[in-house]
């Protein structure tokens, strides 16, 4: 991945720390990957039609699997209606300076004209700050993605439970 033209995380892109090119491949079709594709899609259709292309590669059968209900359906429908290309049950097999290869249905396919690779997978909780504070004797409550990767609904619920116990 280090040799690919332009690699960034979804967090950096959404936070304005990195800027994508014209053909964007997003690896990871979870909530973050789909939200990133949805965010980029208006740039494709509203500002400069046919000037950019967004592809999402997801290993599993289901996009945004951790989301539920109407929110998930709205996100996926909106993303697809904006022209985002989705490859489910596809696994990235190789990333070189010039290409991204993936396996789907037992065949290897290559995207050779992409200029931006966005990583939107593999999030892990980070409890370092809470651990350091606890070691210093400070009472802590670890919530949201710092505790376990999830969604805003779960984080709010966890926060409510802790607040009720204080």
Question: What is each residue range found by the language model?
Answer:
Residues 1-67, 101-166:
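Rossmann-like dinucleotide/flavin-binding elements
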Residues 5-7, 83-85, 90:
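Short, conserved active-site loop motifs that form the nucleotide-linked donor/cofactor pocket
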Residues 85, 93, 110-111:
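Residues that recognize and position ribonucleotide moieties
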Residues 88-99:
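A conserved short coil-to-beta-strand element within the FAD-binding core of flavoproteins
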Residues 75-84:
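Helical element adjacent to the flavin cofactor pocket in flavoenzyme catalytic cores
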Residues 70-74:
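Charged helix-capping and loop-helix junction motifs
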